[in-house]
């Protein structure tokens, strides 16, 4: 009976060592679990970005308002008969807001 108990204790010790310190043990499991959580967060961000891009593509394919808005904002285009006004801040006022002396 003593040999069987000793054998079972050695087997239990080996299993505990493998569980805590061995390959594919608890430490490896927690590291992989953290990596999976990080990758899932990254995937969620990329999915949200893809959804925004698909929505923009659908908007551009669906109507002329989105195309017109982009032409106005990015290219500075105007419709025939419209007057375009560009408001440029006064240089002295801009320098005063930034704390620099006015250049003469």
From Swiss-Prot:
GO terms for cellular component: cell division site; cell septum; plasma membrane. Essential cell division protein. May link together the upstream cell division proteins, which are predominantly cytoplasmic, with the downstream cell division proteins, which are predominantly periplasmic. Pfam families: DivIC. It comes from the Bacteria. This is Cell division protein FtsB. It comes from Erwinia tasmaniensis (strain DSM 17950 / CFBP 7177 / CIP 109463 / NCPPB 4357 / Et1/99). Keywords: Cell cycle, Cell division, Cell inner membrane, Cell membrane, Coiled coil, Membrane, Transmembrane, Transmembrane helix. The lineage of its organism: Bacteria, Pseudomonadati, Pseudomonadota, Gammaproteobacteria, Enterobacterales. Its main location: membrane. The gene is ftsB.
């Amino acid at each position: 009976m003593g040999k069987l108990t000793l054998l079972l204790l050695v087997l239990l010790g080996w299993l505990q060592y493998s569980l805590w310190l061995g390959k594919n043990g608890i430490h490896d499991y927690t590291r992989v679990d953290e990596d999976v959580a990080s990758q899932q967060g990254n995937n969620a961000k990329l999915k949200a970005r893809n959804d925004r891009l698909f929505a923009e593509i659908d908007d551009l394919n669906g109507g002329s308002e989105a195309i017109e808005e982009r032409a106005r904002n990015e290219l500075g285009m105007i419709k025939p008969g419209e007057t375009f006004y560009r408001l440029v801040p006064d240089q002295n006022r801009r320098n005063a807001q930034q704390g620099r002396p006015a250049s003469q």
